[in-house]
């Protein structure tokens, strides 16, 4: 039987709010940078719209480097940068920095992959009608790739949620910190069970709602 006092319930509630805050803000900032980066990777690729081997190689190399670093290692490596950006390395706001840095390369590759799924005939038709690069990207490529981009956003959200829990090892706030401080160090199985249950519920909500949205906007 799970027994929790009022203080622990309040702590768990705060942890849920912090986790949602970290994931939500991280996703927004990640897509602000990751979406354009993915578009650039796509359009500068060999045989694409505006091929540029040097730009594509440099950006692709940087993306691959950051994608290859495990999150916990990246979290530690970015501690000085995190302190510089937000003034501290503890708490949910500080955790957003490494979450964004780790997720941007992931999103960039997701976006690049989604754009590659767009029918070449649609792109050729837009070019034949005199569309410029901005119109081609905003009116053709991104709208046509919306279903795939939505699925990618769901996958990214779940990934970021998992990473946010890992940040608990360094006092990153949210569910991870609660699980470490109360469930691991104090051997409180009740807290561990509830923490896992809440994370599972959040993941299921993201998955179900995200996939419904992707299906709704898929007009193919």
Mark where each language-model region is:
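Cytoplasmic-entry segments and transmembrane alpha-helices of multi-pass inner-membrane transporters
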Residues: 40-77, 99, 104, 110-113
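Transmembrane alpha-helix signature in integral membrane proteins
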Residues: 12-43
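Glycine-rich helix-loop "coupling/hinge" segments at transmembrane-helix boundaries
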Residues: 163-193, 197-198, 218
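C-terminal transmembrane helix and the adjacent membrane-cytosol boundary/short C-terminal tail
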Residues: 40-46, 192-220
């Amino acid at each position: 039987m799970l027994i929790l006092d009022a203080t622990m319930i309040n702590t768990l509630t705060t942890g849920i709010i912090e986790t949602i805050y970290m994931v939500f803000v991280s996703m927004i900032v990640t897509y602000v940078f990751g979406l354009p980066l993915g578009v650039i990777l796509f359009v500068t690729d060999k045989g694409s719209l505006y091929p540029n081997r040097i730009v594509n190689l440099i950006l692709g190399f940087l993306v691959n480097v950051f994608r290859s670093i495990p999150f916990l290692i990246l979290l530690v490596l970015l501690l000085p940068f995190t302190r510089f950006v937000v003034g501290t390395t503890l708490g949910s706001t500080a955790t957003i920095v490494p979450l964004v840095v780790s997720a941007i390369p992931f999103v960039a590759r997701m976006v690049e992959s989604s754009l590659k799924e767009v029918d070449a005939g649609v792109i050729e038709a837009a070019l034949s009608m005199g569309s410029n690069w901005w119109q081609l990207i905003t009116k053709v490529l991104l709208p046509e790739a919306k279903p795939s981009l939505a699925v990618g956003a769901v996958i990214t959200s779940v990934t970021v949620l998992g990473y946010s829990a890992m940040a608990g090892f360094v006092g990153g706030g949210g569910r991870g910190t609660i699980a470490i401080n109360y469930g691991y160090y104090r051997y409180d199985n009740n807290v561990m069970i509830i923490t896992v249950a809440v994370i599972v519920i959040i993941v299921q909500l993201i998955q179900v709602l995200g996939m419904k949205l992707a299906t709704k906007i898929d007009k193919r």
